[in-house]
Amino acid sequence: MKETLSASKIKVLKSCSWQYWCKYILKLPDKTNSGALKGNIVHLIFECLGEERHLKHYKSIIKHKDALLCKPIARLIRKHVISKNLTETEDLEDICAMINKGLMYDFFGNQYGEPTQVISEKDFEIEVNDEDFKYKVKGFIDKLFLYKGISLILIRDFKTNKKMYEGKEISDNLQDYIYTLAIKKLYPEFKDVKMEFLFLKQDIPNEGVMTMENKNEHDLEGFQHELTEVQKYADKFDEKMSLSNLASNQGMPKDGSFSGKLLCGFATKPNEKKKDGNPKWYCTYKFPFDYYCVIDKNKKVKKSAFEKKDLKYLKLEEGDKIVKKKYEGCPAWNVKKDSDPFDLDSF
């Protein structure tokens, strides 16, 4: 199997063929917004406080209900806020609010009794190659609680995005299916697997906690058939297929999910502003841009970035070099006009 699947990779493949082509085949750079950067810091703090040696810091935050009143954690948060060029006012406040919510909601998984084992940042890669199913999938689980006495595993995933899931994002959630399937295969001795999402910008422990419907063997068997088909499609994906499922041709979503034409964004030009002065969001690959990439001796892209300085830290191997390239933009939004035979300026 050529490609290794993941929830995010499959979602992009299903959502927009051109975005998949740009991100995973051409390996173009992607914009990292402030929301994602803040989410990285929140996850880092949760991982740190999940360790037994940092229990006193966890207790300090719970006591004062403020992560910034625990000096070691406050220093760590501020260090990453500064390094990621986030603001020490609104962004810092937002990060601490999400941290407080995550810590105060059953952080050590005692809702089903004391766990036999707690695992933070569990990564996995599952490969199945038999008569019925052929797929390779990987993932990264924020928190895993194992309850041996009641034969239960609880998967918890922290979400730092503003909007909760709706429509197919709930009924056909790829992360839910993939994580549940993986844990069933990694821990076959456990009977039940539960999955929950914690939306840290919402009201927790109320609507901000989204518990997914349990998946039975029939559900997971059907999903493995789907994974097998996706694997075939991803392994043969080429430039011709990049135009086969453009988000711009899918219309607006009717189930409230962030999909279809919404994925393109409403900006008509790069860096366009709203009436209030804030930038309009749009897909990274909607408009043309220049970028830099590291290519090997066979001209294969190893890494790319918008700024050349962001590649300077890489250790280049023999035959590697950094080159500047130009991306022409999404074909749905950047149609090349035929040249004007009477345009003398083009000569």
Predicted regions and their residues:
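RecB-family 4Fe-4S metal-dependent nuclease core
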Residues: M1-F347
